[in-house]
Amino acid sequence: MATHDLTNALDALSVTQHKHAINGIKRGIERESLRIKSDGVISAQKHPEGVGSALTNGQITTDFSESLLEFITPVSESSTQTLQQLKDLQKFTLEKMGDELLWPISMPCFIEHQDDIVIAQFGSSNVGQMKTLYREGLKNRYGSMMQAIAGVHFNISFPDSLWQSLHTLKNSDLSLEDFISDGYLALIRNFKRELWLISYLFGASPALCSSFLQGRKTDLPFKKLGKGTLYLEVGTALRLGNLGYTNSAQSSLRVMYNSLDEYVAGLKKSINTPSDIYGNLDDYTSENPKQLNKNILQIENEFYSPIRPKRNAKNGETPTDALLRAGIEYVEIRALDVNPFSEVGIDIEQFHFLDVFLTYCLLKSSPAMDWEEQTRSTENLDTVVNKGREKGLELNYFNQPRTLQSWGEDIFSQLSEVAKYMDTAYGVSYYSSTIERMATWINNPGLTYSGRYVAELEASGLDNGHYALAIAEKYKQSHQAADYQVFSKQWLEEQVTRSNDAQRAIEQSDSVSFTAFLNAYFDPK
């Protein structure tokens, strides 16, 4: 049963003049994937020349390391087209990689030592050197192994027509820009409250190779499989836990989401406050720098969060300055594991679910969220990460115990109402059918991605690494056999040439030293 506020919002939007206000949701995907050799070992080769410059190619770049590819789709209103673009980008890249493969899961394997992970290189320009030094700082702060974890980022923006309708229906006194920013922050707060559901449904990293731990001790109740596989029998997403990407080293950062000014102030404090932990590492002012600077965060991107408010920044503009200039433009969901059951790392049912879930997060009442509630939400996520498929599991629901099943059923009953509204607006039926199908996963944890993964891993009798390697080989063959669907090979080759030309132009146009460049970046006059 939908809550009163959600029902009212859906009823108001369902009248004729607002009926199609939701039409025009835009999305973009960033999918990360490690390049591996044919034996599964992480590649030590440079970024493939055939895909152009990692600095300036807008579709194919690198993340932390030379071997961690990132595929970026343009913004689109068509989920199907976005998936086709991802296929084209990965097919094209595989053609330039020789006998190398794309790792099909989030957690890395077959890495003997973190020094085997080569930090991404972006050329000799000041901006390229800054990107590499930032990554050097990440290595020295958190270790390279954590940075080798891959994920999928789902970017979404709602159409102006929806914001205008909501602004009218709520009789808001705010400017439309401020109203939109407040709306996205309301979405973010609700997303954080029920983030555990994303981990339960789509978490796909319940297993890892023991080499990932690099000798670190852990209290997690791992079961062993084969020579070196560790897995949580009822876990969901190790990537999102304390072993993974949302590193506990940042747990003391108090970034809040109740207003744009509050969010920006929290981040700016972190990038301007000297760190007690990293102060002994030389920064860019030294002859042999190990990090950009000695602050709690080197730059804003270092803040690990499962969701971020975003605005496209102008040249030389920081992310928070862009937000202050013109408000929130879209949100970036960073909580998705690579989907091992999809050759591109995400599939259409996830698009449909996230459309509904994020619309629900936007339309549902979203009270202010204090630090205690943020902490509670993080603890719920940790619980689901480590034992989300445990029968009768209890979560903390406003300081009262509530079973995951009860809470999940309640959420899905509300998602069902949102899905009906969206189906009517779009003239489709897939939103309702997706929600109806996934609702059955709440009481059948074996249907979740992590449940399926553990079952197939156990049935295969293989180590996690060899199981993933077999998937990688299958997906490479599938990409090779496929035709280009949206991007032509010629267009992709043109982007390679343009990116190489653009990198050269940037390098030739630099007129100040690297130190002077960073002085200006960190202390703009």
From Swiss-Prot:
Pfam families: Glu_cys_ligase (PF04262)
SUPFAM superfamilies: Glutamine synthetase/guanido kinase (SSF55931)
Top class in the EC scheme: ligase
Keyword Ligase carried by entry: yes
An example Gene Ontology biological process: glutathione biosynthetic process
Catalysis performed (reactions): L-cysteine + L-glutamate + ATP = gamma-L-glutamyl-L-cysteine + ADP + phosphate + H(+)
Superkingdom in the source lineage: Bacteria
Pathway: Sulfur metabolism; glutathione biosynthesis; glutathione from L-cysteine and L-glutamate: step 1/2
EC number: 6.3.2.2
An example Gene Ontology CC term for this record: cytosol
Keywords from the named record: ATP-binding, Glutathione biosynthesis, Ligase, Nucleotide-binding
Coiled-coil parts of chain: none
GO molecular function: ATP binding; glutamate-cysteine ligase activity; metal ion binding
Disulfide cross-links: none
NCBIfam families: glu_cys_ligase (TIGR01434)
Annotated family: Belongs to the glutamate--cysteine ligase type 1 family. Type 1 subfamily.
HAMAP family from the UniProt entry: Glu_cys_ligase
The protein's name in its UniProt record: Glutamate--cysteine ligase
Organism placement in taxonomy: Bacteria, Pseudomonadati, Pseudomonadota, Gammaproteobacteria, Alteromonadales
